[in-house]
């Protein structure tokens, strides 16, 4: 299914847009009501990349180039990806360690390349993550990524799972190579996925970071510290013009069986005003619809 921009912006989750938002202007004038759009496009910081409010992650319980999504099998997983796109999801988040590049490439092969965003991550740590022991430089890795993704460019490439507060010093070589790839338009932006408070602080202070994947929800579940410590650093990222991609909105599945916690987490993250897109590791298309409905409800409550 191909949608032009106008069609895309008009799309809302089925049944979730029945309540309309009223918009009052100066002097009490009423603008035409418009449905809340859980998939609305917005900027990823100052990268120039436009992202949908909801993105799909592909690495639930991921490692060794497989994940819950790949374990579904090709037909089911690619059907999930296509269904997400048809609903309005435009951010597809991957990583080398998830083994999901080829699945995403096949699912989106008939879609206009400028209508979706590919984000992926390279594993630089010794041990774990990916099967082989070698850790080639970023130019070699990204070239393989482009072949696997069947694309000339990748929108966002991240250094995966940064835990050390000294990662900007330790990863200087790969950072410089990624900077060169951006200058050559092989990638559009670079950044980090964060897995410690110290690494998050370093990302907020680093001019190199275009965008960061951060773990954020209302309860501190699977996060890098209590929300009262994490949220201010995320705000610094945002104010510095860096893209902010929210992860672990559902606590890596911890809130799956709690309507109250899922709703509270969505409301909390949207209320921060600092997260550009929310990436969730959906495993069923019904989960996409459910999350979109919760986002719609939260947006309407904010209006």
Report each predicted region and the residues it spans.
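Beta/alpha (TIM)-barrel catalytic core signal, keyed to glycine-rich beta->alpha loops juxtaposed to Asp/Glu
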Residues: 6, 161-303
